[in-house]
From Swiss-Prot:
One Gene Ontology cellular component: chromosome
Protein source organism: Mus musculus
Segments of this protein annotated with the region Interaction with WDR82: 67-97
Listed name of the protein: Histone-lysine N-methyltransferase SETD1B
Family, similarity comment: Belongs to the class V-like SAM-binding methyltransferase superfamily.
PROSITE patterns, A to Z: POST_SET, RRM, SET
Coiled coil: none
CDD domains linked: RRM_Set1B, SET_SETD1
E.C. number(s) listed in UniProt: 2.1.1.364
């Protein structure tokens, strides 16, 4: 211490130390204060210096001898071990060598997952070194991404294997090996940039991307590729900037990824929202391009991608991007042959690249091929397949052969990555085979480059997994994401696809939409969309390759495929795949090669233009469209469809044939456009991209030159492209583009529309779609443009044909093309296999790919904008035109109204317009459902119309019941979009009728006479039937007239009609019009034959009416305008004819004809589509509603409505006929109004249907004797003649199935011929033909005679010459002339011949009409075959179109002798009539036996026209179900038909035979027939209303519904007095008589006599309706009594299709299945050359019928809202009838419950004491609280009073039981007593109340304190509970708060004397159930509540 430094010691001041001298002398070095006085008191300071000397000499202090360290040494003796951790080797960007895959990236983690949780989760798989969860640096939000570094590679791999795609905290997590964390960083960037959310992260694609070892590598590769110009932009894995498309996207890297890792679409493929389209909505295409930057890639992809951007993009991007090779392959594929590649490639894949490994080898071959046109094709096909294949491992291997980037890349990469995407590359392959390496060696280097790119860039990782391509999923993952990641990526992608596919609907970026979804869904999504097709396609098309992928793909596909609107595009590509399937093997070498070359060249060009993308996309979309419905078909068809990208839908439509024939189609289609266009394509590549981008948009037309390339790729663009591919196609194609993409795709409309509405919910089976397409296409007739047809036929007679047909339709319904690939244009192949693309130069264009991509993006954007604009415009037009039509109709109605007092029709007509609005809304709704604005959203051309119409199917079903409910028709059919609207309007009409039944009844005759028949009153036999007909006419009159007019001027008028139709049913109408135009030519002769005397237009109209009514009407209409118009025309014309018959009397035939024509023109627009939709729905509704007047009595509510609808339709039709001079439409309106009138009465007499029938008929006749009288005839005639259609419709149902097709067709033919007599033509046809035609149809011979019988009796033109017309009936040749016209359609079915009607259906009509579908059924007249009736209808026979199995056939007819049994449907005369006429023949068999019925019925048919049978049927509805099974079988067939166009054509039927209208719906007629079987139908006959109802119901409901439709039959019978007979002309009489079902007495053989009798009995016949009750009682009543057998208007093809495919919505019952099977077998026997039939294999399936008969849906009391949404509707007024019905029951229940459950919630309800105490108390509490006396005073009083209790006692009270009495005087305002009890909550109080009630405690002692608490004094409390109520109490209760507790205190209100009872006012709330008050006070209220 002393040594311590001086500073330690105070520097000793020398003075202090010892002696001063010493101190001074010694220079101490240190000193220490030894003693401090401050510490030791009493001492002096003592210093020690240098340890030796002290300042004070003191002996006690010794100097320090040894200086040592004073510190304790022990501390330093311990040794601490120091562990220096060995520094770990860090693997960073500078790390050299293979990085051990120990790092695992987690994505999509629940944001609740934290490090500890993740560590615990991972450590079970191995030691975890590091766990890091990434958060957003700004928001610190959990990004769902985590990094886990394992100590061992095994642990990491196991963790990935076990944790990937597992659910953690509710999230399916994505786990992948991320060696360098690149994927994680990508995810991080995507999330931080805000492009994706943790759950939308495109892990699949990113996975594919991440697998690539280093992004840098990828970038460099991408850059290299870019430099090379291969697909660097599109393929460069790392060239984010390189990718042109990428450039647009924020995540250029994504693009780079796309480029780098084409496998992983990354942002696009990944579905990353941002990158999805790389900027443009079609960015997807762009991104597509970017992924496959080379134009070729783009082009190849463009068609699909652009168009199907979403799907293709997704698929392609995912699959493609994932597969590096895909990238370059994409280009290759694209360049090689977008479609061809697809087809070829698919083939190649299937053949060569069956397995992943083979792919590699093959890929080279493919690549080589790709270079050559065939290889290119192969590559393309391969590529396309790849698009699908992404899930199939083959793709990755394919990339290895980058040498042939086109083939290989397209093949492998595309197959692996994405079938669709692969095709894109082919174009590039030529110039730059490898997408990755653009120049390299085009042949050799490209593959390596591409491989190297894929392997090197991303392929390195991707390629190592490439071998996995066989798995598909693994391949994708491995290929794209690298060894580890690829698998996860694929799975993730697939998962994403499945999950997000649907979510992301980049509607406009078709592919993008799909892609986006798929992107998110990962390539699989895109793949899946294609894969879905591939799935089946893979199986067929690419056995090995595809096979694996399809399953995987399918799921994703499903998700994506579901995008119905885009399906077409998807379908295109998928179709390519699908077609490829068939063609893959064949097309690859031949057609594919040329296609490949063309495709490649063109694709390259187009690729540049984005065509490739469109192709892929479109194909995707097309496939989607088709694929969604029938994935298999798509897959099969893809190879060809790719060629006819535009055709995809069509192809899809005929998947079956398409699949097999698709290849051909592809080749043929493709060749057409590609040969000319492909070479030129390169120049227009940029434009094509727009087209590809938006194949659908009409804007594409400019790009057509580029489109040729796109053509293969882009279906829609191909429309323009067609010119190059096929000169003929161009015309078609160009038109197609003009049509709004989603607006006019007839084919699409047919499939998408018919199926569209229901599509989403009801994927169509391949067979189903094939059938439907076949039918529709057949109905459409050969494609308007032979080129496509030729190509299609050449390519695939069946599949392609249909595909082509749609394209033909497409021109009219560009919407096909528009919405998505939309062109049903197989004709516009995506590439022409026959025309090799101009070298693979497009590939060489790779260098420009970025530019091309950029251009494509712009073009795509423009195309999207155009498409959107067009769609919007189209929608607006549709709405506007509809509004205009509505306005026109209103004006017409007003005019008619001025002519006729009856205004019900007006209302109804107005209502119908409403349907149009509804249609518009439906369109929008459909569009919305369509998943976006894109073509997909539009339904691809079916688009608006299709989408709108689909709902109508449902609505119609519902309508019959609604009609029954007086004014609830609207409600009844809440779900039908368009049809529903129509039906709604009809319902409203019916409602109007119901509202003014008497008025109408009184007024109707006049109004009918005035309005319907200016000269003659209504032709309507029965107010009901004719009314219904007129109602239908109103709805269908316009449409029908329009159709008629259109028919007349089909060529010239067709356009306008079409325009209007388009407005209404853009696509469907167009197709129909086309078909009508074709059929019109046929019909023209018919018309001339029918009504030679009439003016051309008038003639046609009249004849059409006749024909339409009986048979020709539908035919004519169909010819003229298509199903909808045809339907309208039929109704109108049919009515017109009948009216003319009356009119003839009043010399109004000409005018009427003219009017009909004019009406046709005017109404056509509005009504045509409305008719198709509305008419089918409205007509049917109206028929049923109008007929209800007659038959409603039977089925008061539903049937009544149906009848009313039918009657209204009939009346409307007649009014239109009679009022033609005034204005067809006005007349039509009149008709509608008139029907209302009759309907009104009918409805009025709902209770007494019989009365109503008679009354309606009588009234109508009185006011419009002629009309009414004729109405009976019309009913008969109409039903018979027009009914023939209806009968045929029944045929479709029961009769129609047997008779419908054959008999009706025959009848229709006959009628068509019959019209040949100018005078007789119209009405004669209707009258006579109806009956005979059915007979004629089924048993050609027997039917002919019956027709004669029928015809002579009722000559339409001249009342006096009914017979001549009848004889003409046998001359059904005209119908025969119209192959499109399916017998059912033209004849009674209007649907069977719906072929023509079908035209209304976008794609279905032609097929149906053509021959096979519906027609075949009726056309082939096989004596023993159910479809022998087809023979009766040569048109059908000749049509040779594939017919839907159940569509036209009269199931039983085959079994029954064609001559007799087939007539069965016609036989459905009213029971009475049947008995009267053919009772013995038809009635017994038909009525009594369900199945036999058809056989017997045909026989009776001759005698008893369908109308009579149907009439009889009305009652049968109840029987129907029993009979239905046998007879109903046909119904199912009809049901099939329903889908086709039953709704539309039926309107004609409706108008013709209002009552019959319902039966037409297929089962309905069958039901009627079934009813007929029960000869009892006599009683049933009165139930004619029932028939109508049955018919309606039948139509609405499969078989159950028919019973309600039956009622419509009776309406005609309503004609009341003979006076009518007198008034009505002879012709009218004839009509009426047949309408009456030819009295039982007359047989078909006796028809002539009967006709004479009818003439005599016409009045009686009217009365027969009256006698309906009698008829019911005595079915065999005289002919007069028998109500005219309502003939149900044949359903339009569209309606048939709707009904047919309605099974997707309502399921199919055993009966339908049975009849379908029968029909199928018969069709097989007949072999009418229906291609689809050969592709169809009957496989048993349990019935899926969800609901039984919807007989009286209304009866449940719950009314369905028309819109299907109660919120949007508000509420409907309730009919008194309904109200009484439920009020009584509810009252009973209400009263009873209180009795039974006194203690329930209202213990005191029965008696005051039982009243719910809680309520009472609550009320009292409220009151008490309201007495807000000062709390202080209350509390004070309470406290004061509490001390002084009042003396009270309880004794028996005179008021009630016990009471509380005062034992001492109580002053006013004093506390008497506190209400004491248990303080309980409301819930407990309620429980106790119930318990007390159960225990028998009647009184309630619960007093509510406040809202929450109640005091229960029931079992514990004080005397206060005994206080009784008094209306003049002496106390009051008050709630006061004491110490925060609420208490109920009873205060005296006044002075209370001793022994005075304490009372207070319970103040119960006012309630319905009153509790009597027993207080007896002077001012007693009498009740406590």
């Amino acid at each position: 211490m002393e040594n311590s430094h001086p500073h330690h010691h105070h520097q000793q001041p020398p003075p202090q130390p010892g002696p001063s001298g010493e101190r001074r002398n010694h220079h101490w070095r240190s000193y220490k204060l030894m003693i401090d006085p401050a510490l030791k008191k009493g001492h002096h300071k003592l210093y020690r210096y240098d340890g030796q000397h002290f300042s004070l000499a003191m002996s006690s202090n010794r100097p320090v001898e040894i200086v040592e360290d004073p510190r304790v040494v022990g501390i330093w003796t311990k040794n601490k071990e120091l562990e220096l951790s060995v520094p770990k080797f860090k693997i960073d960007e500078f790390y050299v060598g293979p990085v051990p895959p120990k790092q695992v990236t987690f994505a999509k983690l629940n944001d609740n997952v934290r490090e500890n949780f993740l560590r615990d989760m991972c450590k079970k798989y191995g030691e975890v070194e590091e766990v890091e969860i990434l958060y957003n640096p700004k928001t610190k939000k959990h990004l769902g991404i985590a990094k886990v570094v394992f100590a061992t590679v095994r642990g990491a791999k196991e963790a990935v294997q076990h944790l990937h795609s597992t659910s953690v905290m509710g999230n399916i997590i994505h786990v992948e090996l991320d060696t360098k964390g690149e994927t994680r960083m990508r995810f991080y960037e995507l999330l931080v940039t805000g492009r994706y959310t943790p759950q939308t992260l495109p892990v699949g694609e990113l996975d594919a991307i991440s697998p690539i070892v280093s992004e840098t590598l990828q970038l460099s590769d991408a850059l290299k590729r870019l430099k090379d110009g291969s697909l660097s932009a599109g393929c460069g894995s790392g060239s984010s900037s390189v990718t042109p498309n990428s450039g647009g996207t924020p995540f250029s890297q994504d693009t780079a990824y796309s480029s780098c890792r084409l496998d992983t679409p990354n942002s696009y493929g990944q579905g990353t929202p941002i990158t999805p389209r790389l900027g443009t909505p079609f960015s997807q295409d762009s991104s597509y391009s970017s992924r496959q930057p080379t134009p070729s890639y783009l082009f190849s992809q463009d068609p699909t991608a652009t168009f199907k951007a979403r799907r293709h993009e997704s698929k392609f991007t995912d699959a493609y991007n994932r597969r590096h090779e895909h990238h370059y392959v994409h280009n290759s594929a694209v360049a090689g042959a977008t479609a061809p590649f697809r087809g070829s490639s698919d083939l190649s894949f299937g053949t060569v690249g069956s397995s992943g490994t083979p792919f590699k080898a093959q890929s080279q071959d493919a690549t080589t091929f790709a270079h050559t046109p065939p290889p290119a094709q192969t590559a393309t096909a391969s590529g396309f397949k790849s698009a699908f294949s992404p899930y199939q491992t083959p793709a990755p291997p394919f990339p290895p052969p980058p040498e042939e980037p086109t083939a290989t890349a397209a093949f492998g990469s595309r197959d692996s990555g994405e079938f669709r995407r692969a095709p894109a590359p082919p174009p590039l392959p030529p110039a730059e085979p490898p997408a990755k390496e653009k120049p390299g060696t085009p042949p050799g280097p490209p593959p390596p480059d591409s491989n190297s790119m894929e392997l090197g860039g991303r392929p390195t990782f991707g390629w190592s997994p490439e071998p996995c391509d066989s798995p598909g999923t693994p391949t994708l993952e491995s290929s794209p994401a690298g060894p580890e990641k690829p698998h996860d990526s694929l799975d993730s992608r697939i998962e994403m696809l499945l999950k997000e596919q649907r979510t992301k609907l980049p509607f406009l970026r078709e592919q993008d939409s799909d892609t986006e979804i798929q992107m998110e869904g990962s390539p699989i999504s895109s793949s899946s969309s294609q894969l879905s097709p591939l799935s089946h396609f893979g199986t067929n098309s690419q056995p090995g390759f595809r096979g694996p992928s399809p399953p995987s793909s399918r799921p994703s596909s499903t998700g994506l495929e579901d995008i119905s609107p885009t399906p077409l595009p998807d379908s295109d590509e998928d179709e390519d795949l699908g077609l490829g399937l068939g063609p893959r093997p064949p097309p690859e070498p031949g057609p594919p090669d040329p296609m490949g070359l063309l495709g490649q060249t063109a694709e390259v060009d187009l690729d540049l233009a984005g065509d490739r993308t469109p192709t892929s996309e479109r194909m995707d979309e097309g496939q989607q469209s088709s694929g969604e419905d029938m994935e298999i078909s798509d897959d099969e068809m893809p190879s060809a469809p790719i060629t006819s990208a535009d055709c995809p839908k069509p192809m899809v439509v005929t998947p079956g044939a398409g699949a097999v024939a698709a290849p051909n189609v592809l080749a043929p289609n493709l060749p057409l456009p590609p040969p000319p266009g492909f070479p030129p394509l390169p120049p227009p590549p940029p434009p094509p991209p727009p087209q590809p981008g938006f194949p659908m948009p009409p804007p594409l037309p400019p790009p057509p030159p580029p489109p040729p390339p796109a053509h293969p790729a882009v279906t829609v663009p191909p429309p323009p492209l067609p010119a190059p591919p096929g000169v003929p196609p161009p015309p078609i194609l160009p038109p197609l583009p003009p049509f709004p993409p989603g607006l006019f795709p007839v084919m699409q409309v047919d499939m998408s529309h018919v199926l569209g509405g229901q599509w989403g919910g009801m994927p169509m089976s391949f067979q189903m779609q094939t059938q439907m397409l076949s039918r529709l296409m057949t109905g459409q007739g050969a494609c308007p443009y032979p080129p496509f047809m030729a190509a299609a036929a050449a390519a695939a007679s069946a599949g392609l044909q249909f595909v082509n047909l749609p394209p033909y339709r497409s021109p009219f319904s560009l919407s096909n093309s528009g919405p998505g690939r939309g062109q049903h244009w197989p004709p516009l192949p995506k590439f022409d296999p026959s025309v090799p693309p101009p070298g693979y130069i497009p590939r060489q264009e790779d260098p420009h790919k970025a530019t091309v991509d950029g251009v494509l993006l712009v073009v795509l954007k423009e195309l999207k904008a155009i498409m959107k604009r067009d769609l919007n415009r189209k929608m607006v037009e549709v709405v506007a035109f509809r509004a205009f039509d509505e306005w026109w109709d209103k004006k017409e109605r007003m005019a008619k109204a001025s002519l006729t007092p009856v205004k019900s029709g007006e209302h109804k007509d107005e209502d119908r317009p409403k349907p149009k609005d509804r249609i518009a809304s439906c369109l929008l709704e459909s569009w919305g459902k369509g998943e976006g604005l894109g073509y997909e959203g539009l339904g691809l051309g079916i688009g608006l119309r299709g989408a709108i119409r689909l709902p109508s199917f449902k609505v119609k079903r519902k309508e019959p019941p609604d009609t029954a409910s007086s004014g609830d028709q609207k409600r009844l059919r809440p779900s039908t979009s368009v049809d529903e609207e129509d039906e709604e309007s009809e319902r409203e009409r019916d409602r109007d009728i119901a509202d003014a039944p008497c008025e109408l009844t009184k007024r109707d005759p006049k109004s009918v006479g005035v309005r319907r028949r200016p000269g003659r009153p209504l032709e309507l036999d029965s107010g009901g039937e004719e009314d219904e007909k007129e109602s239908l006419s109103a709805s269908s009159s316009s449409s029908a007239s329009s159709s008629s007019g259109s028919s007349t001027t089909s060529p010239s008028s067709s356009a306008s009609d079409k325009e209007e139709e388009d407005r209404e049913s853009t696509e469907e109408e167009e197709e129909e019009e086309e078909e009508e135009a074709e059929e019109e030519e046929e019909e023209g002769p018919r018309s001339r034959i029918s009504s030679p005397s009439s003016s051309s237009s008038s003639d046609k109209d009249d004849e059409d009416d006749n024909e339409a009514d009986s048979d020709g009407q539908i035919d004519s209409d169909i010819d003229d305008q298509g199903a909808p118009l045809s339907e309208a025309s039929e109704k109108d014309n049919g009515d017109s004819e009948e009216e003319e018959t009356e009119s003839i009397t009043t010399s109004k035939a000409p005018a009427e004809s003219s009017s009909s024509s004019s009406e046709s023109s005017g109404s056509s627009e509005f009504e045509s589509s409305s008719e198709s939709e509305s008419s089918s729905s409205s007509s049917e509704d109206e028929e049923e509603m109008t007929v209800p007047g007659v038959e409603e009595e039977e089925e008061e509510e539903e049937e009544e409505e149906k009848e009313t609808a039918m009657a209204a339709a009939t009346v409307v039709a007649m009014a239109e006929e009679s009022m033609p001079p005034a204005g067809g439409q006005d007349f039509e309106q009149d008709r509608a109004e008139v029907p209302l009138g009759p309907r009104g009465p009918m409805r009025e007499s709902l209770g007494t249907e019989e009365e109503v029938d008679i009354e309606a008929e009588d009234e109508v006749p009185e006011m419009q004797a002629p009309e009414l009288e004729e109405p009976p005839l019309p009913m008969g005639a109409r039903k018979l003649e027009g009914s023939p259609e209806p009968p045929e419709e029944p045929g479709p149902n029961t009769q129609g199935d047997m008779l419908l097709s054959p008999e009706l067709p025959a009848r229709e033919t006959e009628e068509a011929q019959l019209p040949s007599p100018p005078e007789h033509g119209p009405e004669s046809d209707l009258d006579m033909e109806p009956e005979p035609p059915p007979m004629l149809s089924l048993p050609l011979q027997p039917p002919l005679p019956p027709p004669r019988l029928l015809r002579p009796p009722s000559p339409p033109p001249e009342p006096e010459t009914p017979e001549p017309p009848k004889p003409p009936v046998p001359l059904e040749p005209p119908p025969e002339d119209h192959p499109p016209r399916t017998p059912g359609l033209c004849g009674s079915l209007a649907k069977s011949q719906s072929t023509e009607t079908v035209p209304a259906t976008p794609g279905g009509e032609p097929p149906l009409s053509g021959s096979s579908s519906g027609l075949s059924l009726s056309s082939p007249q096989v004596p023993g075959s159910p479809f022998s009736y087809p023979s009766p209808s040569p048109g059908l026979s000749s049509g040779g179109l594939p017919r839907t199995p159940g569509r036209d056939f009269s199931f039983t007819p085959t079994f029954p002798e064609p001559s007799g049994p087939l007539l069965l449907p016609v036989c459905p005369l009213p029971t009475g009539r049947r008995d009267e006429r053919t009772g013995p023949l038809a009635s017994p068999v038909l009525l009594e036996t369900g199945l036999p019925l058809p056989l017997p019925l045909p026989l009776p048919l001759p005698l008893a026209l369908p109308v009579p049978v149907l009439r009889a049927q009305p009652r049968p509805p109840p029987q129907l179900p029993p009979l239905l099974p046998a007879t109903l079988a046909p119904c199912p067939t009809p049901i099939k038909r329903k889908p086709g166009r039953p709704r539309r054509s039926p309107p004609s039927m409706l108008s013709l035979d209002g009552p019959l209208v319902r039966p037409p719906p297929g089962p309905a007629l069958g039901r009627d027939l079934l009813l007929l079987p029960g000869q009892p139908p006599a009683p049933i006959f009165p139930s004619a209303h029932d028939p109508r109802a049955v018919t309606l119901d039948f139509r609405n409901t499969g078989i159950p519904a028919p019973p309600p439709p039956l009622p419509p039959q009776p309406p005609p019978p309503p004609p009341p007095p003979p006076v009518e007979s007198t008034k009505l002309p002879f012709k009218e009489l004839d009509n009426q008589w047949p309408s009456e079902a030819i009295p039982p007495g007359p047989r078909r053989d006796e028809v002539t006599e009967e006709y004479v009798d009818l003439a005599k009995v016409r009045g009686p016949w009217r009365r027969p309706p009256k006698k309906r009750h009698e008829d019911l009682v005595a079915p065999s009543a005289s002919p007069e009594p028998s109500p005219p057998q309502p003939l149900f208007r044949p359903r339009s093809e569209f309606e048939e299709m709707t009904i047919l495919y309605d099974i997707w919505n309502g399921g199919i019952d055993e009966e339908d299945i049975r009849f379908l099977c029968v029909t199928y077998e018969r069709l097989l026997q007949q072999d009418n050359g229906m291609d689809w039939l050969n592709d169809t294999l009957w496989v048993y399936h349990p019935s899926t019928s969800l609901s039984s008969a919807k007989k009286k849906k209304r009866e449940d009391g719950i009314r369905e809202h028309v819109t299907g949404c109660a919120r949007s509707e508000g509420f409907y007024t309730i009919d008194k009838k309904d109200k009484l019905r439920y009020l009584n029951s509810s009252r009973a229940s209400t009263d009873e419950p209180p009795m039974d459950t006194q203690g329930m919630s209202i213990p005191a309800q029965p008696h005051a004491s039982t009243r719910a105490g809680s309520e009472r108390r609550s009320e009292q509490r409220r009151l008490l609280s309201s007495f807000t006396g000062s709390c202080d005073s209350d509390l004070l009083k309470f406290n004061q009073l509490k001390f002084r209790k009042k003396k009270l006692k309880f004794c028996k009270s005179h008021i009630h039981d016990w009471g509380l009495f005062a034992m001492e005087p109580i002053a006013a305002d004093e506390m008497v007593i506190e209400y004491v009890g248990q303080n309980i909550r409301q819930v407990i109080a309620d429980m106790r109340e119930k318990r007390y009630e159960d225990e028998g405690i009647g009184s309630s002692y619960m007093f509510r304190v406040d809202h929450d608490t109640i005091i229960d004094a029931t079992k514990c409390g004080n005397f206060a509970r005994f206080i009784n109520h008094s209306c003049n109490p002496n106390c009051y209760a008050k709630v006061i708060t004491v110490e925060s507790q609420k208490k109920i205190v009873i205060y005296s209100k006044q002075h209370i004397n001793v022994n005075e009872e304490i009372t207070y006012d319970y103040k119960f709330p006012i309630e319905d159930v009153k509790i009597p008050c027993l207080c007896g006070s002077e001012n007693c209220r009498g009740t406590l509540n």
